[in-house]
Regions:
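C-terminal glycine/acidic-rich active-site capping loop/insertion
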Residues: 65, 75-92, 98, 123-175
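Glycine-rich phosphate/pyrophosphate-binding beta-alpha loops
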Residues: 107-120
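Contiguous C-terminal substrate-recognition/catalytic subdomains in enzyme active sites
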Residues: 89, 100, 115-118
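Predominantly a Rossmann-like dinucleotide-binding segment in NAD(P)-dependent oxidoreductases
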Residues: 1-90
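Beta-strand scaffold of nucleotide-dependent catalytic cores
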Residues: 15-18, 110-113, 136-137
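Conserved hydrophobic/aromatic beta-strand scaffold that supports enzyme active sites
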Residues: 17, 98-100, 110, 126
């Protein structure tokens, strides 16, 4: 919600562009029955997309054009935990997606959602405006530090706590 306040206060000016990323090795690493995430109707867009897309709409307004490409890097996955550990299951859907989203305000944001990345620790979004840049924490976590930079090398760390925000009733960004 701190990101929403920064935008409302014009802290980074008019937002021109941005990017977001959620990269993860897949549900087979942490769930004993992950197959539904890899069947038709599953995948990273269905699982994580709503968090990132609703946050972007909350911060930038409606999207007017979206282009996407999905890729499936493997036809099988292996259970890594649970009673089926070591067994394989079929993958039916794309497991990595790249996005190009154009908003009504003419901002363009690129994104990447993936169940194919083994080691990544920067799940977040960045927005770049005419007066500065902002790093928004992973929307799936509903809070965390927001970094604001207005000139080369400068950063502001703020803690986004939904319970103290004037936007508390919409803390998940879904209204």
């Amino acid at each position: 919600q701190l990101a929403r306040e920064f935008i409302d206060n014009g802290e980074i000016g008019k937002i021109l562009t941005g990017n977001f990323i959620f990269a993860f090795p897949g549900m087979q690493t942490c769930h004993p029955d992950p197959e539904s995430w890899f069947k038709k109707g599953g995948g990273p867009v269905i699982d994580m997309g709503p968090y990132f897309f609703t946050t972007l709409v909350n911060l930038l307004g409606p999207a007017k054009n979206i282009r996407s490409r999905g890729l499936k890097f493997s036809n099988n996955r292996t259970y890594e935990i649970g009673p089926k550990k070591g067994q394989q299951f079929n993958v039916e859907v794309s497991t990595s997606y790249m996005f190009d989203i154009e908003f009504d305000n003419n901002a363009v944001v690129q994104g990447f959602l993936s169940f194919d990345v083994n080691n990544h620790c920067q799940n977040h979004m960045e927005l770049y405006g005419t007066e500065g840049s902002m790093i928004v924490p992973d929307p799936n976590m509903f809070g965390g530090p927001v970094s604001l930079s207005k000139e080369l090398g400068s950063k502001y760390q703020g803690q986004s706590d939904p319970t103290t925000s004037k936007y508390y009733e919409n803390y998940s960004g879904r209204q």
